Amino acid sequence: MCIADITRNAHIYPYMTLEDLALLFIRGIGSRGAVHLVDHFGSAEDVYAAPRSALINDAGLRPELAERIVNGDGMHAAEAEVVYCRKHDIRIISATDAEYPLPLREASDRPHVLFVKGNVDALSMRTLSVVGTREISPSGKDTTNRLVGDLATAIDDLCIVSGMAYGADGAAHRAALAHGATTVGVVASVLPEITPTAHRALAEDILRNGGAIVSELHSQTKQNGALFIARNRIIAALSMGLLVVESPATGGSLSTAEIADSYGRVVMAVPGRMTDSTSFGTNNLIRCGKARLILSASDIIEDLGWVPKSKQQPQIKVTEDDTLTPPQRMILSAFDTASTLDYDELITATGLTMGELAMELMELELKGSIRLLPGKRYERV
């Protein structure tokens, strides 16, 4: 495909138009600004169609930024980005896309666009984010391998999310691969490049085994240290739980744990001996009540409310759950006429907004009332 083949308002993917991507390339807007504008106007197309006065007075943009949108800035760069991504087999997903991960969508500082290489469905599996020090000890590696292995044995559709860095990240990804679980790497580099370069082979193994590599960075991004900090928020938001396997008194994994806590995620930590410097951080998280103590995979399963395979039995529901909210009852009622429904069908059936539906679906999954199937369809349990 050449640039001339791409037009404005064209759906470059089923749920995404060129305008979604173009907002990223407007100087002074970026991902955070794009999220704000789309939330305000309803869609990226509506942002570009908005009059200058609305952009300034209603959305609060500076006049020069409004002018860039009115002039169609970012469109040509977006066209080139589509060509680049198709050349490298990279999927582009906007925050309004049905394939955008539900836990990430509820974060206020979510990326407006994700670039995904590999299996997009991996982002919607039963995910656990695992982080820790880059100087992981042999004991920390063994613990990571044991916990991930036991989880993979006990839980269907397990996906381990981590950051592709040295140390605990690499140990988590490799443990998932060794035990037949899916794993997703979130990188602070422009795809298809992998940092560190020593983990390129690991990335290939992840992709070969049904996982994915994720970045929020378009191909024109200039590398800088702040990108790694920003990457951590994606790791924290992608899962309902975050496990810190080993950390010294300071470090990036503790920052990620803080971010996860701010998102309302379940933060967990593995304790270590009081003389082990690589456990000072995790021990302190537990001591201060900022993380739940993890001694086994069973603790993780219990803290996240997961149901292990051994306890999964067909059940006949006699009465409706009294804890269901009215929107949740509407969602479940929609399955009376169809065995499976996708995101758009549920919006049509319930009249809920995208944000409302995302939150209610997550609650219903946690309650065990519905489950997500391959292909982004839901079924009632």
Language-model features and meaning:
Residues 5-99, 285, 367-369, 374-381:
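Short, small/acidic-rich helices and loops at N termini and domain boundaries
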